[in-house]
Curated annotation (Swiss-Prot):
Organism: Arabidopsis thaliana
Major subcellular site: cytoplasm
InterPro entries noted in UniProt: HAUS4
Compartments where found: Cytoplasm, Cytoskeleton, Spindle; Cytoplasm, Cytoskeleton, Phragmoplast
Protein name: AUGMIN subunit 4
Length: 423
């Protein structure tokens, strides 16, 4: 856009160009986005903060996913042992990648359940020292009471912060629960401060009562080591998947250490490819615009040729064709009149006129007799209908009886003929 302004500035006065240069030098951002320097610096800070937040979120989500996967694999081992009657459950741990005792996984599962329930209740987590801040409790309690449905809209700012805080604290085994008095007053969206029948007071009681028998430091160390090992294994697999031919030929084993460099190199290569493709696209667009302009010019020339040359001759040809068709129609009309006169001449000869008169008289007499018979029949029918309104029904029944009688007579005649043939 700055280049466009610079191109347009060539036609502007000198004082306007000087003003634009001063604005670009002292007020506008150096990237050509046409925003002020203060806004540009705030935007850069916001982008850096968003990048850091995204990095923290991804780290927390990776730890949380590994913790959930550990609990699922532990439950899978227990299920296989129960169905298969295996007494040595710990023998299945190495096959599933589990390296700690059942107490660690049970404690982790318990803390996951409590933390997720606290998140659904929109409650703050217990602090590192086990203390509960009354100010935060009151704030979140007011937010929870004002909600109509505490279970349907869990993706809010509070639930997001709780999930991030919990995912960060899952490796450090920070307990999740709080002590609140349950409010049992029904509202439109259900009972507030409840989720599937779980109240804050019950959640706090479960969290504070269920303490593990092992040392907290050992629990945190075991959990952190296993999560670190699982993440490192996945990083090694990812590095092996994207390693180039040079590294694979030299047999470099320290692939996880160079993973960020490889990822950065691949990202830069993809960005270069995208820039090249974008440049090709712009070049293709420019060529297409040029081709389109040439085609428009060619089309204009063709239209001019058609209008100036071909259409003029076409109009003359159409006029001649119309005249020829009109003459042909007149000729056909004359031929039809001739055929009509010939037909009349051949039909009305001196010999056939007397015969035609006789035929006409016969047809007139036959028409009069038929009309008289029809009128007589109509008159008699009306007389019969006047005598009996059901005459039509009786006549139809009589007709049916006569047909049946004729059929019976024909059948009797056939039987008599068969008997005579047998005699």
């Amino acid at each position: 856009m700055v280049k466009a302004l610079q191109g347009a500035a060539q036609n502007l006065p000198a004082d306007v160009n000087q003003l634009i240069d001063q604005l670009e030098r002292h007020c506008l951002a150096p990237d050509g986005s046409l925003v002020t320097k203060s806004v540009y610096s705030d935007l850069q800070l916001a982008r850096e903060e968003m990048s850091r937040e995204r990095l923290r979120y991804l780290e927390a989500m990776a730890i949380y996913c590994e913790a959930v996967a550990m609990v699922e694999e532990y439950q899978q081992a227990i299920s296989v042992a129960n169905h298969g009657g295996i007494r040595d459950v710990q023998g299945l741990y190495p096959q599933l990648g589990l390296k700690n005792s059942p107490q660690v996984y049970e404690t982790l599962e318990h803390r996951l359940v409590v933390a997720e329930a606290a998140q659904k209740l929109r409650l703050p987590l217990i602090s590192d020292g086990g203390e509960i801040h009354e100010e935060e409790i009151e704030k979140w309690s007011i937010l929870s009471r004002s909600s109509l449905d505490s279970a349907s809209t869990s993706f809010t700012i509070s639930s997001t912060s709780n999930s991030v805080n919990y995912a960060n604290s899952s490796a450090n085994s920070v307990a999740g629960g709080i002590s609140l008095s349950a409010v049992d007053t029904d509202v439109v969206g259900g009972v507030p401060n409840r989720f599937l029948g779980i109240t804050p007071a019950y959640l706090s009681y479960v969290q504070l009562q269920n303490t593990i028998s092992m040392d907290m430091a050992d629990y945190q160390m075991f959990l952190a080591r296993e999560i670190e090992g699982r993440l490192k294994e996945k990083c090694d697999k990812l590095a092996d998947a994207i390693v180039d031919d040079t590294d694979s030929s030299t047999g470099n084993r320290n692939s996880s250490a160079r993973l960020p460099e490889r990822v950065k190199f691949i990202i830069e290569e993809i960005e270069r490819d995208e820039a090249a493709l974008r440049e090709d696209l712009y070049s293709a667009d420019r060529k297409f615009a040029e081709y389109y302009n040439v085609l428009e010019q060619i089309l204009g020339v063709l239209i001019k040729l058609v209008k100036d040359l071909k259409l003029e001759h076409q109009h003359k040809y159409n006029e001649m064709q119309k005249t020829w068709l009109c003459k042909r129609c007149e000729t056909m009309n004359a031929k039809l009149r001739v055929l009509e006169n010939v037909l009349l001449l051949e039909t009305y000869t001196p010999d056939s006129i007397s015969a035609l008169h006789n035929i006409r008289n016969y047809l007139v007499e036959a028409t009069e007799e038929a009309s008289a018979a029809y009128n007589k029949a109509v008159t008699r029918l009306r007389e019969y209908q006047g005598v009996d309104p059901h005459f039509d029904t009786i006549a139809r029944q009589y007709h049916d009886i006569v047909k049946k009688l004729e059929n019976m007579q024909w059948t009797i005649h056939q039987v008599e003929m068969d008997l005579k043939s047998h005699d």
